[in-house]
Each structure stands twice: as structure tokens, then as C-alpha cells.
């Protein structure tokens, strides 16, 4: 991973000399080191650094680095004693539910039902905690639904703290190595997701650095390796992996077509560098990757990777919140912005070569407000090239208005329940499931729904992760949670399905019900089992609320096939007679439709010099590219996989 480390120690020596001159002697500086994209200053007396409120800002300005001040590890109280003391300092009314320590950054995470009481008036209690235990406290509200995924991730980071710190220092030295070249050229190569949906992977190359944006798997094409995985056979990518030259991977969001192949790289030791993404994306992609290998096991298929490979992904992930600017290579600076697609989804902005070129890569995005999220960000400091999705880029790809979609959903549900049927809504565990939950929750609150809403698959765990990150949700939901004291995710109408026996009981029951189950495309997961048993009964309905990829069972049902062969777990093929009503309501998609895509181009600022359309069926990428050029006069391309485009 580490390349051309020459001069790093000399650079650090110069930085230390500047810091010693600017920082009060009583701070007791013990070490200065690059850790990941930050410059970390370790001190014996952190309080001395806080007396001058402008000190850190001035240091960052002079050094042109992101500065973090941490207590020297030697002054930290042992976690057991620190926890005991924190509980003595914080009033019991705060209702602390968990205290966890991250030795790699000297931080203690305090979860409490009333975080304001942990902070104290004007931050007095927080300062007292810092003085007494020396750990840097971070206070968060206790998630109303406990997430096993989040707990496991925190446990891994705590257990592996020594290796984690060593890793961060290696990353820091790689980022701040002395550049051997002044950036003169930039190009991108499509390794997957160009003129197709699935296996998204884009390689950004300069004469100094290599960065990969997304690395997904096409779950609809797993039987065909030539279509399922990114192009490992691309000469430049093979060279980068063989020589260990890849500086970083950036993940736009958690869905498997963007993150599903990450653990594979660690299984075969093809990469050991940093992965950058938002905290919710790290948690959600962990959940989805774990589910992916479980489903492969259940289907009798050798999984692409193992749980310990997912653990390696966690250990190598560096999280950024929206708007935080970080150096990730000597000539590349990264900022993540809200994409409005799913929890934690990001538009990637890359500032290359100190003003040479700026790229925004949208990933999957939504450009209108939804119940869960604010619209995608469309303003950037600088922008020359925009790489944008085209899932609904065709000239006729206009989705139903959101209000109309919600009305239609309620109508179909009401009609189905009235005739004693069950409603099956296949949904991705992350995104559409929670969006539909919010629609149904509001309708239930006014008495419109009186039957249980069953959540099957990973939906309950994914929802728990949503409740842990309210700051990433829409303003409306944040106001409900923080100001009105009401959390819509906790409505008792939602029932979690614990196992296959409960699932069968729901199917066998003669009572009407609403079932939201994974997967959204009927590719594995409990939604397939529900479909097989509910499809023959005309009283029932299936409602598709998200994109159905070519080659999936969902696409076959959506097209109106009435007899569908399905291979069972025993290897036998059974023909399913589809007599249930089939409905598609596009208005709930997390992807921008044609209207939103064109609107985004009209509103994005600064106006880009070039737009590249990706992540869509070939004719949709081409249609959108052509339309943008005709309407806005902007240079456009709709490249194929393996095409390389020089941007500068």
C-alpha cells in the first residue's frame, strides 16, 4: 500500500517544529503523526490546547492539514475505571445505556436517552469528564432500536484498536508522501456499471494516484461471471492491483451493486488500503454483505468471501460526514455530499491537483424531497466533470408524482385487504422499505390501516440502523423525533418476523396482512417464499416499488408472465401460477427519473464542462447523454465498460 515514502519523516519533522512554536508548552506535546487523512497531535494536557479557541484553526491554516488533538495514550484511565467515573459524574437522569471506548482515537462514546444531561449546562459535565478520565467524550442519543450490526462494528474497532492505529499511520504516510509528479493528466476507466445497472466500479487515475469509486456485484447475473463482477481483466486495473498502487476506495452507498465486492479484495489480498464512506454506509454495507453470503450459503453456492473478510473491510474503513474535506492522496481531496438515495448515500466530489480538475460522481441519487431524505446536493465549490446515473434516463422514464404514488399505494392495499387478501411488497432492506414504512405509518395513525404490517428479512435491522443516524434523515422526521418526541419507526403496527416458522404462519393465516420483505427484485430472501405461496391466490396483490433489473424474477413478474418456473432449494423446478394482482408504482424509487435528471443538470453549479452518463441500460445512457447535449450544449459521453476517458 505504501509507495514512495521518501521525505515523509522530514515533512513531519518540519511540522513538529512549527507546532512546538505555536502550541503552549504546558500542553505537553508527546507525538505528532499522520493518521489517515488527519494530522494528529498527542498531548499530556488536552485542556491547555482548548484555552485558545483559535489555536487549532490557526494550526490548520498554517499547515494546510486537518488537525486532530488527542490525549496521549499513557494518560488515559483504564476503560473500566473511566466508565465507573463517568457514571459518577453524569446524573442518573441522563439514563446512560452504553459506554464504549475506541483506543485507536482516544475516544469514549457515551450513549444516553437524554444526551443533554451528559453534556451539562454550557458543556460543564463534558469538560469535567475530559479532565477526570482524559478520554475525549462523544455523546449520542441512544438508538430506540438496538442494532446488532452497530454493536459488532464498535466491538471490532475496539478490539482491533492497535492494528487500526498502525493502519491509520500507514495511510497517513501514503497520503502525505512527497509527490513525484505534478498532476498533468486525469482519466477515468469504467470497470462496471457503464451502459448497464449493476457491478458499479470506476477507476480514477492521475500521473500520481489511483482511486476507485464503488466496487459492486450484479446479483442478478451471478451465474455469468462475465456480467456479475467488475472487470478485473482491465489491464490498468490488473496492474494497479498487482503492484499495490491503489490509494483508496470510495463507496457512494451501501447497496450491493456498489459495495458488494469489497470483501473479495481482502479475501485474496488484492488491497489493504483505506475505504472512505459515511458512517451509515459502513454499517449498512456490513449488514448487506453479511446477508449476501448467508443467502449464497442457503442456495448451496460457495460464497465469494467470508465473514472475516467483511471484518477486514470494517477495519479499513474511514468514515466521513457530509461536507468534511479530506486529503486521500497527494493530489486528490475528497468531499462527500448528500445524494438523497438511501441512508448515508453520497455524491463524491474529487478536487484534483490543487485546482487542476474537479469531478462529481453522483452514484445513485434523488433530486426531490422524500419522506426519508432531503434532495441531492447540486452546488459544489468547483466542477468540471459530472458523472451521473441514468437508471431512469430514457425519454419516457417519468415516475408518478410522489403524492399520486402514495395515494395509489393506499388504494391497492385497501382494495386487497377489503377482499381478504394479503399484500406483498418486495423491497430492498435499505431505502425503499423504510420509505414505504413511513407512508403506511402515517396512514395507520389516522386509522386507515388496522392490520399488522410484517417486516421480514433484514428490514428490522436496517431500520434499527436508520434510528441510530437521525441527523441523516429528512428535516420532517428529525423534527418528529427531537421536537415532538415521536419516532414513527416505533409504531406498534410494525411486526418483525423472527424466523421461517413465523413466516409460514403468516402465509397460512386466513387474515389479511401487509408484508414488506427482502429482496426487492425477488432474487433470494423471504420475498421469494412469500411470492411462491401467495401468487396463485387472486385475492392477493404484489406491489413493486423499486427498479427491477433485467434477468430477475421481479422483472418477469412485472412483465406479466403468468407461469414462471422457479428452482427450489432441493434443485427441482416448479412452475408458479401467478394469479395475484401485479402492480408497479414507480413513484417510490430512490433514483431520479428523467425529469429530475434533466432538472439536476439545469441546476447544478458550477455548470460542468462535461457530463458522462452511467448506471443505466445502454439505450437510457445514450438517450440521456444526447438529450443533455441538445438542450444544454454541454459535451456528453455514454461510455461502455472498459472505455477510458481522458478528462485533462
Swiss-Prot record:
Its EC number is 3.1.-.-. One of its GO terms (molecular function) is RNA binding. Residues 396-589 are annotated as: Beta-Casp. Disruption phenotype: Essential, it cannot be deleted, and enzymatically impaired strains of FttA could not be generated. In depletion experiments transcript 3'-UTRs become longer, suggesting transcription termination is altered in vivo. InterPro entries: aCPSF1, Beta_Casp, KH_dom, KH_dom-like_a/b, KH_sf_prok-type, MBL, Metallo-B-lactamas, RibonucZ/Hydroxyglut_hydro. Residues 590-648 are annotated as: Metallo-beta-lactamase C-terminus. Zn(2+) 1 binds at residues 253, 255, 341, 364. Residues 77-144 are annotated as: KHb. Zn(2+) 2 binds at residues 257-258, 364, 615. Pfam families: Beta-Casp (PF10996), KH_TffA (PF17214), Lactamase_B_6 (PF16661), RMMBL (PF07521). The keyword Ligase does not apply. Residues 9-76 are annotated as: KHa. Residues 185-395 are annotated as: Metallo-beta-lactamase N-terminus. Gene3D superfamilies: 3.30.300.20, 3.30.300.230, 3.40.50.10890, Ribonuclease Z/Hydroxyacylglutathione hydrolase-like. Its cofactor is Zn(2+). SMART domains: Beta-Casp, KH, Lactamase_B. Terminates transcription on the whole genome. Termination is linked to FttA-mediated RNA cleavage and does not require NTP hydrolysis. Cleaves endonucleolytically at the RNA exit channel of RNA polymerase (RNAP); the 5'-3' exonuclease activity of this protein degrades the nascent RNA released from RNAP. Belongs to the metallo-beta-lactamase superfamily. RNA-metabolizing metallo-beta-lactamase-like family. FttA subfamily. Homodimer. Probably interacts transiently with RNA polymerase (RNAP), (via at least the RNAP stalk subunits Rpo4 and Rpo7), interacts transiently with the Spt4-Spt5 complex. There are about 2100 +/- 500 molecules of FttA per cell; RNAP is estimated to be present at about 3000 molecules per cell. This is Transcription termination factor FttA.
Amino acid at each position: 500500500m505504501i509507495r514512495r515514502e521518501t521525505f515523509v519523516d522530514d515533512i513531519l519533522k518540519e511540522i513538529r517544529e512549527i507546532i512546538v512554536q505555536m502550541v503552549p508548552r504546558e500542553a505537553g506535546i508527546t507525538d505528532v503523526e499522520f493518521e489517515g487523512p488527519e494530522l494528529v497531535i498527542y498531548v499530556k494536557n488536552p485542556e491547555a490546547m482548548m484555552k485558545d479557541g483559535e489555536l487549532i484553526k490557526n494550526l490548520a491554516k498554517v499547515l494546510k492539514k486537518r488537525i486532530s488533538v488527542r490525549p496521549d495514550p499513557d494518560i488515559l484511565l483504564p476503560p473500566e475505571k473511566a466508565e465507573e467515573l463517568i457514571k459518577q459524574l453524569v446524573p442518573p437522569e441522563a439514563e446512560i445505556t452504553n459506554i464504549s471506548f475506541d483506543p485507536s482515537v482516544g475516544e469514549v462514546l457515551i450513549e444516553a436517552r437524554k444526551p443533554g444531561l451528559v453534556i451539562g449546562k454550557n458543556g460543564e459535565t463534558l469538560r469535567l469528564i475530559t479532565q477526570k478520565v482524559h478520554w475525549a467524550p462523544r455523546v449520542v442519543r441512544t438508538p430506540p432500536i438496538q442494532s446488532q450490526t452497530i454493536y459488532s462494528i464498535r466491538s471490532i474497532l475496539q478490539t482491533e484498536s492497535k492494528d487500526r492505529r498502525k493502519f491509520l499511520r500507514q495511510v497517513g504516510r501514503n497520503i502525505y508522501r512527497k509527490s513525484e509528479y505534478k498532476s498533468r493528466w486525469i482519466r477515468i476507466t469504467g470497470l462496471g456499471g457503464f451502459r448497464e445497472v449493476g457491478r458499479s466500479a470506476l477507476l480514477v487515475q492521475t500521473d500520481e494516484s489511483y482511486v476507485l469509486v464503488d466496487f459492486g456485484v450484479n446479483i442478478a447475473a451471478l451465474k455469468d461471471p462475465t456480467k456479475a463482477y467488475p472487470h478485473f481483466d482491465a489491464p490498468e486495473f490488473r496492474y494497479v492491483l498487482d503492484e499495490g498502487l491503489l490509494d483508496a476506495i470510495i463507496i457512494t452507498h451501501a447497496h450491493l451493486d456498489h459495495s458488494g465486492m469489497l470483501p473479495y479484495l481482502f479475501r485474496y489480498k488484492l488491497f489493504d488500503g483505506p475505504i472512505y464512506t459515511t458512517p451509515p454506509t459502513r454499517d449498512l454495507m456490513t449488514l448487506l454483505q453479511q446477508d449476501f453470503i448467508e443467502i449464497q450459503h442457503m442456495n448451496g453456492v460457495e460464497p465469494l468471501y467470508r465473514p472475516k473478510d467483511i471484518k477486514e473491510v470494517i477495519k479499513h474503513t474511514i468514515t466521513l460526514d457530509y461536507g468534511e474535506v479530506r486529503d486521500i492522496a497527494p493530489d486528490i481531496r475528497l468531499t462527500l455530499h448528500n445524494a438523497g438515495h438511501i441512508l448515508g448515500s453520497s455524491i463524491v466530489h474529487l478536487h484534483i491537483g490543487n485546482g487542476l480538475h474537479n469531478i462529481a460522481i453522483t452514484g445513485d441519487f434523488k433530486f426531490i424531497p422524500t419522506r426519508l431524505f432531503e434532495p441531492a446536493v447540486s452546488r459544489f465549490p468547483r466542477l468540471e466533470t459530472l458523472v451521473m446515473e441514468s437508471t431512469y434516463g430514457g425519454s419516457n422514464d417519468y415516475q408518478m408524482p410522489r403524492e399520486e404514488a402514495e395515494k395509489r399505494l393506499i388504494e391497492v392495499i385497501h382494495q386487497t385487504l377489503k377482499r381478504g387478501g394479503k399484500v406483498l411488497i418486495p423491497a430492498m432492506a435499505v431505502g425503499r422499505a423504510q420509505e414505504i414504512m413511513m407512508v403506511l405509518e402515517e396512514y395507520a395513525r389516522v386509522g386507515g390501516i388496522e392490520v399488522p404490517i410484517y417486516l421480514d428479512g433484514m428490514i428490522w435491522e436496517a431500520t434499527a440502523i436508520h434510528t441510530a443516524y437521525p441527523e441523516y434523515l429528512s428535516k420532517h422526521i428529525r423534527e418528529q423525533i427531537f421536537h415532538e418526541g415521536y419516532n414513527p419507526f416505533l409504531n406498534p403496527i410494525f411486526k418483525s418476523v423472527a424466523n421461517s416458522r413465523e413466516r409460514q404462519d403468516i402465509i397460512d393465516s386466513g387474515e389479511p396482512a401487509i408484508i414488506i420483505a427482502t429482496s426487492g427484485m425477488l432474487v433470494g430472501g423471504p420475498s421469494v417464499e412469500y411470492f411462491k405461496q401467495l401468487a396463485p391466490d387472486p385475492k392477493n396483490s404484489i406491489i413493486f416499488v423499486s427498479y427491477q433489473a433485467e434477468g430477475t424474477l421481479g422483472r418477469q413478474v412485472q412483465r406479466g408472465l403468468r407461469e414462471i418456473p422457479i428452482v427450489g432449494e432441493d434443485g427441482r423446478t416448479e412452475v408458479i401460477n401467478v394469479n395475484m394482482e401485479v402492480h408497479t408504482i414507480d413513484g417510490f424509487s430512490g433514483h431520479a427519473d428523467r425529469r429530475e435528471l434533466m432538472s439536476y443538470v439545469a441546476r447544478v453549479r458550477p455548470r460542468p464542462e462535461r457530463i458522462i452518463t452511467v448506471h443505466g441500460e445502454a439505450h437510457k445512457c445514450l438517450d440521456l447523454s444526447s438529450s443533455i447535449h441538445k438542450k444544454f450544449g454541454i459535451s456528453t459521453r455514454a461510455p461502455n465498460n472498459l472505455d477510458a476517458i481522458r478528462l485533462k
